[in-house]
């Protein structure tokens, strides 16, 4: 059996006594008690010693408790400061009155009538006073009657003392009888020891290279947050800047500015979280109004009907981050623009394994002279490739504010082709009211869908759980790809 030098020293020190307190062994071995406990636990794992833990609890006075020692509890001091009765006004002049009056009444020592404090004659010391006297005499006391009351009042505090008794086992004594080599073992070798050959005569510490080390659990970023951070880093590397905005948006920016008709089903109560707040319309909103009613100055016919400013002022929890994209474009109508947003959006969804009422969405826009659909497909293919999806394809799609529109799909082993968001080129009805004269490429995707594929999850709700074991076991690289 291979023992460390400290285990051997422990057995040698313990042998003559058979059993001893760790503090005694520490003095004999010229080391710390904590070190002895560590050596004993190692030897205990080998069956050479038994380690017994003893926990003793005691109460010691607090700073306030020490202030009363030799004088008595506040209520006793105040009670003994007057004869049979005293006006309340005079009693309140005592420095301990605020503490003592309540306790004297609670213990039944006094009665207060007409502003006069009268002793009741029932002033025998209770368990708390007896405990306080013992505490003052000894400086510490064990738990007992009245001690808990002192602790509740902040006059005493519990302290825990842990002691360890180490006893040698028959197996340990047998090993000790065979003799132990107490020479210092070398755990490392210097260059000089190797060159001179001195290492050949040194007692070398033995290592079991087949034994697994204790598993370490360092701090880890939540797997879902790690994927979000990865997406953000990829887009920064692709030359995008990040845009941000509030989760509360007016219906104007969330719907109307994106040429979504005011009677569209997505604007119904069952799909959107409407708020009681209203916000004024921005300058130039009339161009959006005209676009809805008759197509403005474009060849579009618009949606017809009468556009309602009141509906546009109604605030909602944003249903998509595209509301931030159009505001960014309105503030930067001249190219080049290359921006993205990662943010939470809100929908009135029935919660189940594939739907949540709130989730994260990624939104990207590119505006420049002469950009077209091929540029859009190139951006998307590069982004998904950097996310680890090697096979990407596109199929035609439809979205209210883009034309043409495409839906990107990625190939996942075991699942086949999976749709991951929507994209297209903003319609003229969206860009014209804000003086944007160049094409705007736009795309968005639900980050949670990507995360589920990367992490191999089947329930969307698991992305938001605080399961420490799951966080520990999930590979840092992001899991399945």
Curated annotation (Swiss-Prot):
Top-level division of the source organism's lineage: Archaea
Keywords associated with the record: Aminoacyl-tRNA synthetase, ATP-binding, Cytoplasm, Ligase, Magnesium, Metal-binding, Nucleotide-binding, Protein biosynthesis
Keyword Transmembrane helix included in the entry's annotation: no
Cofactor needs: Mg(2+)
SUPFAM superfamilies, sorted: Class II aaRS and biotin synthetases (SSF55681)
One Gene Ontology term, aspect cellular component: cytoplasm
Cellular location(s): Cytoplasm
Residues binding Mg(2+), per UniProt: 403
GO biological process: phenylalanyl-tRNA aminoacylation
Catalytic activity of the protein: tRNA(Phe) + L-phenylalanine + ATP = L-phenylalanyl-tRNA(Phe) + AMP + diphosphate + H(+)
Binding site for L-phenylalanine: 322, 361-363, 401, 426
UniProt GO molecular function: ATP binding; magnesium ion binding; phenylalanine-tRNA ligase activity; tRNA binding
Enzyme Commission designation: 6.1.1.20
Note accompanying the cofactor annotation: Binds 2 magnesium ions per tetramer.
Plastid keyword on record: no
Family statement drawn from the similarity comment of this UniProt entry: Belongs to the class-II aminoacyl-tRNA synthetase family. Phe-tRNA synthetase alpha subunit type 2 subfamily.
Subunit structure: Tetramer of two alpha and two beta subunits.
Protein name: Phenylalanine--tRNA ligase alpha subunit
Native species: Methanoculleus marisnigri (strain ATCC 35101 / DSM 1498 / JR1)
Recorded name of the encoding gene: pheS
